[in-house]
């Protein structure tokens, strides 16, 4: 199964509890379709370069997923319908990176 990097921005109005519920809901969608969640990172509540849907900030999150192309297509279709997700980007990757992402490393400095 191919490896995917799925990065999304959730609404700024979500509490940490609601954001955790959103991530659990997304991961259950994946596992229902036979996909496997390999890694999850929360990058924080960050400012936008421009306003999106009258919002200036959003919760940035990244998930590494091992899934079939058809299950990823279905997952992306359902994420588009979720009003809490403002934007997302799904990239196919060759391998899972070791350690934390650059965003996490930059926040630790």
Curated annotation (Swiss-Prot):
The keyword Cell membrane does not apply. The keyword Nucleus does not apply. Signal peptide: none annotated. InterPro entries: Ribosomal_bS6, Ribosomal_bS6_sf, Ribosomal_S6_plastid/chlpt, Transl_elong_EF1B/ribsomal_bS6. Keywords: Ribonucleoprotein, Ribosomal protein, RNA-binding, rRNA-binding. One of its GO terms (cellular component) is cytoplasm. GO terms for biological process: translation. It holds the Pfam family Ribosomal_S6. It comes from the Bacteria. SUPFAM superfamilies: Ribosomal protein S6. One of its GO terms (molecular function) is structural constituent of ribosome. PANTHER family: MITOCHONDRIAL 28S RIBOSOMAL PROTEIN S6, SMALL RIBOSOMAL SUBUNIT PROTEIN BS6M. Binds together with bS18 to 16S ribosomal RNA. Belongs to the bacterial ribosomal protein bS6 family. This is Small ribosomal subunit protein bS6. It comes from Ehrlichia canis (strain Jake).
């Amino acid at each position: 199964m191919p490896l995917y990097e799925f990065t999304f921005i959730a609404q700024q109005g979500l509490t940490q509890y609601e954001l955790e519920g959103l991530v659990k809901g997304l991961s259950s969608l994946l596992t229902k379709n036979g996909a496997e969640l390999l890694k999850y990172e929360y990058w924080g509540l960050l400012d936008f370069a421009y306003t999106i849907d009258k919002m200036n900030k959003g919760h940035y999150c990244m998930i590494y997923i091992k899934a079939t192309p058809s299950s990823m297509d279905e997952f992306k279709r359902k994420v588009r319908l979720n009003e809490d997700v403002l934007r997302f980007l799904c990239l196919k990757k060759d391998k899972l990176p070791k350690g934390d992402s650059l965003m996490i490393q930059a926040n630790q400095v």
